[in-house]
Amino acid sequence: MSKKEIVAMILAGGQGSRLGVLTKNLAKPAVPFGGKYRIIDFPLSNCSNSGIYTVGVLTQYKPLKLNEHIGIGDTWDLDRRDGGVSILPPYQKEKGGDWYKGTANAIYQNIEFIERYDPEYVLILSGDHIYKMDYDKMLEMHKQKEADATIAVINVPMHEASRFGIMNTNEDLSIYEFEEKPEHPKSTNASMGIYIFNWKILKKFLEEDELDPSSSNDFGKNIIPKMLNSGKKLIAYPFNGYWKDVGTIESLWEANMDLLKYEDELSLYDSEWKIYSANPVRPAQFIGKDAEIKSSLTVEGCIVHGKVENSVLFQGVYVGKGAIVKDAVIMPNTKIEDNVLIEKAIIGSEAIVCKGCKIGDGNKISVIASKEVVIGSKEIIEECAMVK
C-alpha cells in the first residue's frame, strides 16, 4: 500500500438505543434520512468531496444493512485498489478479541489498518451526524497552527451547552480546557466529535490509554483530557454550517423537517457538494388525480393518491385514497392504505398502516417500527395494535 497523507476512520458501530424501534434491527448510521439517503452517506460523501479516499468504517451493532449499503464504495468513488473504503468490524486476534469498548478503543483495535498507509494524520468521524463539511479546510488549519490535534466545534445556545462536551479556547483558538457536559458552561463551543490528529502522537496516547484499567477508552472522556494535561497543542476549528446529531427520535424528525424549510441550511441541492447514496432504480413517482402535495419531499417510486403535507416520503411509499399524511417521515416501501390519518410521526421501512387507522395527535412524535402492520385506530401510537 502506498503512503497516504491522511486516513479517515468513521465510527459507525453505535446501537442508537435512543431511536427505539427504528434501530431494533439496524445500526444507527444505516437509518434512512431525507427521502433518498442513509445517515452514513453524509460522512462518506464529505470524505469523497474533500479528496480523502482512504476510509475505514468501524462497524459493530447490526451491521448487515450498513455493510450492504456501503458495498465496495463505488457510490462515493471509494472503490479503489490502493485505499478506498474498508469495513472494519471487531475481530479475533492472536491474543483474543473483544467488542469495541469505546471510541478510542475502536481506533486502537485498528492500529494495524492505519499503519498500512503510514499516514501523517488521522481524521476521526462519527457515522451518525447530518452535516456537510470540507475536511480539507480543517486539515489546512491543523497544519497552519502546527497543532497536535484539531477539534471541530459548533456554537450552540448557552441553555443547550450543558448537553455537549465544551471546548474552552483562547483568542487564537487554542483549547485550554475541555468540559464534558458541564452544569455551568464557560463557553458555547460544542465538540462535534470530529478530530484530526497527528498519527504518531495519537498512536502513543491510544497505547497508553489501553493500559489504563480505569479508562473508559473514549476520546472525549479520556484521550482529549490526557492530551491537554500533557501540554499538547489542541486547536478548535469553528464550523458555521448545518449540523445535527440525529441520535434521538426528536432530532431525527426535526432534521427531516428542516429539509422542508424555504431556506434549507443543509441544501441537498448544492451541485458543488453533493451527497451520494446507493439507491435502487425506481420508476418515476405517480401523483393521482385527486392527490394533493404541499411542502414535501417525494422521490422516485412513490405513488400518492391522498394528501401529503410537510412530509418526507422515501422510495416506494404508497399513499392511498383519502389518506392524510402531515408532518411525517415515511421510510422506504411503506404502504399507507385508504383513509389513514398520520400526523407528526416516523413510520419505519416496509410497514403497512391499514385502512382507517389514525396515528399521532400532532403533539408528540409517534413511531412505527419497520415491517410492522398497524391494524388499530388509535390517536397515540403506544395504543395502536401492531402485529408482525
Swiss-Prot record:
SUPFAM superfamilies membership: Nucleotide-diphospho-sugar transferases, Trimeric LpxA-like enzymes
- Keywords assigned by UniProt? ATP-binding, Carbohydrate metabolism, Glycogen biosynthesis, Glycogen metabolism, Nucleotide-binding, Nucleotidyltransferase, Transferase
One matching Pfam family: Hexapep_GlmU
As recorded in UniProt, its EC number(s) are: 2.7.7.27
Pathway membership: Glycan biosynthesis; glycogen biosynthesis
Q: Where does alpha-D-glucose 1-phosphate bind?
A: 100, 165, 180-181, 191
Spell out the molecular function terms from Gene Ontology: ATP binding; glucose-1-phosphate adenylyltransferase activity
> Is-annotated flag, keyword Lipoprotein?
no
| Top-level taxon | Bacteria
Cystine pairings recorded for this chain: none
User: What is catalyzed by this enzyme?
Assistant: alpha-D-glucose 1-phosphate + ATP + H(+) = ADP-alpha-D-glucose + diphosphate
Can the keyword Cell membrane be found in this entry's annotation?
no
* GO process terms (BP): glycogen biosynthetic process
The record's comment on protein family reads: Belongs to the bacterial/plant glucose-1-phosphate adenylyltransferase family.
Name the PANTHER family on file.
GLUCOSE-1-PHOSPHATE ADENYLYLTRANSFERASE, GLUCOSE-1-PHOSPHATE ADENYLYLTRANSFERASE-RELATED
The protein's role, per its UniProt record: Involved in the biosynthesis of ADP-glucose, a building block required for the elongation reactions to produce glycogen. Catalyzes the reaction between ATP and alpha-D-glucose 1-phosphate (G1P) to produce pyrophosphate and ADP-Glc.
Fill in the subunit field for this protein: Homotetramer.
- For this entry, the protein name equals Glucose-1-phosphate adenylyltransferase
- Gene this chain is encoded by: glgC
